[in-house]
Amino acid sequence: MTEPKSYKDTVNLPQTDFSMRANAVQREPEIQQFWTENCIYEQLSQNNPEDLFILHDGPPYANGSLHMGHALNKTLKDIINKYKLLRGHKVRYVPGWDCHGLPIELKVLQSMKSEEREGLTPLKLRRKARDFALKTQQEQAEGFKRYGVWGDWENPYLTLTPEYEAAQIGVFGQMALKGYIYRGLKPVHWSPSSRTALAEAELEYPEGHTSQSIFAAFPIIKSSKDAQEILDPFLSNLGVAIWTTTPWTLPGNLAVALNPELTYAIVEQTSNLCNYQYIIVAADLVERLSATFSTELTVKATLPGQILEHTIYRHPLYDRESEIVIGGDYVTTESGTGLVHTAPGHGQEDYIVGQRYGLQVLSPVDDAGNFTEEAGQFSGLNVLKDANQAIINELKNKGSLLKEEPYLHKYPYDWRTKKPTIFRATEQWFASVEGFREAALEAIKSVNWIPPQGENRITPMVSDRSDWCISRQRSWGVPIPVFYNEETNEPLLTEETINHVQAIIAKQGSDAWWELSIEELLPEQYKKDAHKYRRGTDTMDVWFDSGSSWAAVAKQREELKYPVDIYLEGSDQHRGWFQSSLLTSVAVNGIAPYKTVLTHGFVLDEKGHKMSKSLGNIVDPLVIINGGKNQKQEPPYGADVLRLWVSSVDYSSDVPIGQTILKQLSDVYRKIRNTARFLLGNLHDFDPEKDTVSYDQLPELDQYMLHRITEVFTEVTDAFEKFQFFRFFQTVQNFCVVDLSNFYLDIAKDRLYISDTNSLRRRSCQTVLKVAVESLAKAIAPVLCHMAEDIWQFLPYKTPYQSVFASGWVEMQKQWERPELTASWGKLRQIRTEVNKVLEQARNEKAIGSSLDAKVLLYVSDQDFKKQLESFNPNDSLKGNQVDELRYLVLASQVELVDSLEAIKKADYQSESELVSVGVVKAEGQKCDRCWNYSTKVGEFSDDPTICERCNAALVGEF
């Protein structure tokens, strides 16, 4: 007896060197090396045919390691840039760094021994700060590159370079010459712990701050003319009640403000609450205050607020008299007494009211937060420590204290030192927003805000904001280029002085301000008077630094443009960089520096908690990429999985990350990779020039698949155009799993493996696989850039493009659009799903192993549908196009369309549904040794007695 033949060498199995495992830790850097060596980004950014596209980088702070917020932000930017490159745009991305300011100064000071700090000059400190910033910038740049981010890494922008600083001085100068810059004694957010003024964006409001709040009464000594008749009967024993959460500001009290629209009451208290039998409060609050003070308050008279204006009271702690004044709509009955203690040196609203009434700006507090001699008996006490209690005790002694109680509220802290700030009037430099507020609000309307609520956030911020305090009392920053007359203290700030300093800084950097003599810093016409001047020691707010980047980078670099296409940062930047950039750009040029602003949320842990060292829930992007110390618990996922996470989340709100999420994403990544590997493996012998099958010759299944490809990649394109990357993620994942792996490729194996190499049946399928693999590589390239390039480099045929990024975006042909196929193939896919359920039932009960062991019976009641199915079920496997057949659709050896439900009911395994009823029985005939299908023809071919008619034909090139 002869040995049965082996047919394994006659089957076309997949062949590819594209690895099933990504091995990202090793492979991704190799791909990045390929991009660098071949200047892929540089070539495309210069040679692409379409318009220039500029996403302008908001500079991260050159301070510390990269965190998940950086990873989210930089990856979002890179996804957009890579998509625009694939669409043929010239994309120039210049990464930037914010290098000045207090946080860096603090890091440097913390690293120094106390004796080192003793002899520290501004220049020594600046050099150390510069070294620290540059070292951090280099480390961060390496991290960003490892994420796969493309950009002009050799030529980033740093806010500490001479050309940047000079452009910033230019912005300041233009604003000064337009009258928008002024010096004033005004209350600003002051950080005693940092000893400098702070901008709104440098504050944070932690939960759980408790202040000691007080109610106090000030003695009324003289009535206003209009209120005389009502007040005089009570005047000998009358107080006006105020409430404050900052008792330390009482030494600065110069007025009490009321709301002219409110009605006020004179109430009597008889329980020795304070020294005054009668007190004035808002009429609406009498009941609430009775409860607060735990004493009966009896209304003796009421009067409109307006007539109390100019009533005079005496300060309970000092020998000075002040007036009751009309405040703004901030005086309400929501809390307090309806009358507001007003200290123009300690509050923005107080200051505005004080200006209206010509009040002094009194702020008896020094840089460290200690009372000065102006505060009298409290001199030397610290306002955030012992001053509050001392003042409360003194009010008690004077019989003015009505009540003290702890008050939990939001209070501004210094974002770096994490310590409370105060409002304190100091001589500062301001940008007067009033001068260009309307223009800024108009500019906001011209911008495309994504998501749209971004506009609703920034509009009230700009419309309500006070003037911008731009001076800082620190050394590490760009100097405010002003000189002061030694005798009069008057500032010298002219076009000539600004231009001269700007030219010096452009050559020598801002150290020159500290290095050169006054004579050298002054222009020619002022040199002879140099001895009369001293240089200013203030530096500019870092938000003015980064807020000038449109001028120092976008406008100044030839390869860029202004306004730019897009700014993209976290939602906290509505009060930070988006706003400072808008204000400077509008002040100087009357336009917004950006056309679109896109914002993202913050990164939280898997439980939705903020990440913090104390909670131990910090996720480190480099650990995601390279793995942690324990690689079982923290495996190395590579940059692409991190990037896939970025594309999977709805970044418009806060986004979670953690090991469970990463594991799920890693599974999705692997599915996409395995799909690509199958496609590549089955194209190993395909030469597109010779083997492509024309569209009209393709079986209907393939035409349907090209239609699906059109639908899928139209959706993906729309997702990228609208920056909705989570739609890309869902669509591509679904396409790879549902359309390809579970459907088309599952059916395709029979065509690809057992047909003759050159058969139409096989080449038509490969024609679709080529479209699928190239479309997939291009579409995932903005996100999974390393995998996309890897796929492209393993294409088994020649292409004219060195890199996937040079190949352009997904191309779809008009003729592939066949919506009518969606309906008919939708039904066929439904039949496949129903059949699979019954096959699974038979498999579970061990009636069959593979689905090829089965014959499937189908019954449909709809006659038209039955006709369609009959055309998909020829009697002879070698007739028709050998693809559009029910047996291949359901992967069974035979399919029979039966005329009645009875036949189905006789089957061993069955199911009924509205569309189709399914029965499964054992397949007829014998199993073919080559394709494992059952056939009644096995044994009919004397040379090959163990194979079926299809395989017999395939071996001679006819199937």
UniProtKB/Swiss-Prot annotation:
A GO-annotated cellular component: cytoplasm
Protein's cellular compartments: Cytoplasm
GO MF term set: aminoacyl-tRNA deacylase activity; ATP binding; isoleucine-tRNA ligase activity; tRNA binding; zinc ion binding
EC number: 6.1.1.5
Domain of life, source organism: Bacteria
Motif ('HIGH' region): 60-70
Motif segment ('KMSKS' region): 610-614
UniProt binding sites for L-isoleucyl-5'-AMP: E569
Cofactor(s) needed by this chain: Zn(2+)
Record's catalysed reaction(s): tRNA(Ile) + L-isoleucine + ATP = L-isoleucyl-tRNA(Ile) + AMP + diphosphate
Keyword line: Aminoacyl-tRNA synthetase, ATP-binding, Cytoplasm, Ligase, Metal-binding, Nucleotide-binding, Protein biosynthesis, Zinc
Annotated positions binding Zn(2+): C928, C931, C948, C951
Pfam families found in the cross-reference section: Anticodon_1, tRNA-synt_1, zf-FPG_IleRS
GO BP annotations listed: isoleucyl-tRNA aminoacylation
Coarse class of the protein's main subcellular location: cytoplasm
Annotated ATP binding sites: K613
Purpose: Catalyzes the attachment of isoleucine to tRNA(Ile). As IleRS can inadvertently accommodate and process structurally similar amino acids such as valine, to avoid such errors it has two additional distinct tRNA(Ile)-dependent editing activities. One activity is designated as 'pretransfer' editing and involves the hydrolysis of activated Val-AMP. The other activity is designated 'posttransfer' editing and involves deacylation of mischarged Val-tRNA(Ile).
UniProt family annotation: Belongs to the class-I aminoacyl-tRNA synthetase family. IleS type 1 subfamily.
Subunit structure: Monomer.
Domain notes from UniProt: IleRS has two distinct active sites: one for aminoacylation and one for editing. The misactivated valine is translocated from the active site to the editing site, which sterically excludes the correctly activated isoleucine. The single editing site contains two valyl binding pockets, one specific for each substrate (Val-AMP or Val-tRNA(Ile)).
Listed name of the protein: Isoleucine--tRNA ligase
Organism: Rippkaea orientalis (strain PCC 8801 / RF-1)
Gene: ileS
